[in-house]
Amino acid sequence: MGISKDEYLKEEKILSKVQKLLGDTLNELGKDVYQDEEDFTEFKKMMWENSSSFDAGEMRQVMAATEQEAEKVLQKQRYFKKLCQIKTKPYFASIVFKDDHGKIWNIYISLTYLKDDDFNNILYDWRSPICSLFYDYEVGPCSYVAPGGEYFGELKRKRQYKIENCKLVGVFDNSLNIDDEVLQEVLAHESSDKMKNVVNTIQQEQNQVIRNLEDHNLIVQGIAGSGKTTVALHRIAFLLYRL
């Protein structure tokens, strides 16, 4: 269902704050990436110029150090590219989760994570454990599994957004997960419970396949265009995130 005008204005303010933080982070990270590339080039040059004085054991250590430095640079570059990807559409959904200790968590779900200067999570990567609540549950009692164990609580709200060119153009609350933009626009006004339940079942089953950690081999059957390839690609992304 649609949300009130006050709620809509509140969401616009949140989007504005996220956009500013995202812009600031990109500026700082861009400088870091550029400097890292220069430093790494100098590091390789130094290693190469001194390589003749290394024995076999020292050379292995040099190679390992070089690979380690290269991986640090690549990780930062990959994160920078991800932030560039979400610059105009920083997030697509949010949940309000009340844990069994009474603490309220406002989780904004994105393609990657974003932290503020105090290292607080502002955006959560969709692959993180707590974000599975958005895909697996309707509003009500819920739980998710994280490295520290299983956490219980109540899903108070599920909200989805349509953001275009940094502007909020659509928001609706729904107990379900709707992945289709046309359906989002319809549901922002009204639709039958039957339609909502059908879409929810599909999305929930897809998420179960994507996040399955118990079975090493999975067989997914479906007609052409049913989303098998999409599920496979998202499963690969999820498994890589878990490494």
Residue ranges and their predicted role:
Residues 1-199, 203-211:
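Extended, charged low-complexity regulatory segments
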Residues 220-222:
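Hydrophobic anchor at the beta1->P-loop junction of P-loop NTPases
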Residues 214-218:
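Pre-Walker A (Motif I) flank of P-loop NTPase domains
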Residues 230-243:
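Walker A/P-loop NTP-binding motif
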Residues 225-228:
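Conserved glycine(s) of the Walker
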